[in-house]
Every structure is written in structure tokens, then in C-alpha cells.
Regions:
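Acidic, metal-coordinating catalytic segment for phosphate/diphosphate chemistry
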Residues: 2-5, 50-155
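Active-site nucleotide-donor binding segment shared across nucleotidyl transfer reactions
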Residues: 11-40, 44-51
Length: 155
């Protein structure tokens, strides 16, 4: 589907889920502003998981229903909803925004520094095995010694 159509669908979902979220942001190819979009990726931090789950159930038929990922079909479009918390927010948003190639590059850079960028969005592990507190996507690039790239610059 075209980017504008995907944004319109995201906005419909956003206004339904926002009352139950501390944060909610579109990710994936929409956030990267790609002309063509396959599905809708959303990263959120719930304030009331029970009410949020009920509202997600009302969006459409479930595809997957996990603890960290819920997938539904909303008016014929697949919607992937990723659950974050304050500790995982920035890393999960970065990973779910992509692109795949960008994520591979970031993971390789982390590995070259003796660190591990968790592909599931759980954070960055330093050489000593400790989770590094992350506040923003910009900080991830800084820790990895790389210049920050806006989402639309990530391929």
C-alpha cells in the first residue's frame, strides 16, 4: 500500500490505543517514510495492559498474541504491535524501525566493540555482560561510535 494510506490506518489505530499508552509511535517502513508499505509496525509502552489488550482485540482478528508482540489484521492490513518498557523503548524503536540492513550494520558495529545489540530490542550488552541504560536512539549510535541517522536515512 502507499505511504499515505498506511499513515491513515496508523492514525486510526493510534487514536484507539493512545488512551492506554504512555508512549506510542509508528515504526518500520512508515517511520522510514518508504513509498510502499507492507504492514504497520507500532511500538508502545502500555499504561494499562489489560485495557490496551481489550482494545487491540477489538481492532480485528488476531494473527499472533504474545507477551511482547501482538499481531492483528485491521481492515485487511497486518498490524504488528510491539510492547516496550522504559528500559527497552529506545532499542526496540530502533530495531523495529529498521531497515534490516541498518540493523545488521549496527549489530556488527556493536560486536566489533565487544558489545551485543539485542535484535529483540532488549538493549545493548557491554563487554562485561551488563545491560547499558539507553535513553534514546541517538545514544545508541553514540555508544557505537557512529553518527546518528534519522529514520528516513536508514534505508
Amino acid at each position: 500500500m502507499k505511504l499515505q494510506e498506511a499513515l491513515s490506518i496508523f492514525n486510526e489505530i493510534y487514536y484507539r490505543l493512545k488512551p492506554h499508552c504512555e508512549k506510542i509511535v509508528v515504526a518500520g517502513s512508515i517511520r522510514r517514510q518508504k513509498a510502499e508499505v507492507r504492514d504497520i509496525d507500532i511500538v508502545l509502552i502500555p499504561t494499562n495492559p489489560g485495557q490496551l489488550s481489550q482494545e487491540i482485540d477489538r481492532l480485528g482478528p488476531p494473527i499472533a498474541d504474545g507477551e511482547k508482540l501482538k499481531q492483528v489484521e485491521y481492515n485487511g492490513t497486518q498490524v504488528d504491535i510491539y510492547y516496550a518498557n522504559q528500559k527497552t523503548w529506545a532499542t526496540l524503536l530502533l530495531i523495529r524501525t529498521g531497515s534490516r540492513e541498518n540493523n545488521i550494520g549496527l549489530c556488527s558495529q556493536a560486536q566489533s566493540l565487544g558489545m551485543k545489540l539485542k535484535a529483540n530490542g532488549d538493549g545493548i550488552i557491554d563487554a562485561g555482560g551488563h545491560l547499558i541504560p539507553i535513553e534514546s536512539e541517538e545514544q545508541i549510535y553514540q555508544i557505537l561510535g557512529l553518527p546518528y541517522h534519522e529514520p528516513w536515512e536508514r534505508g
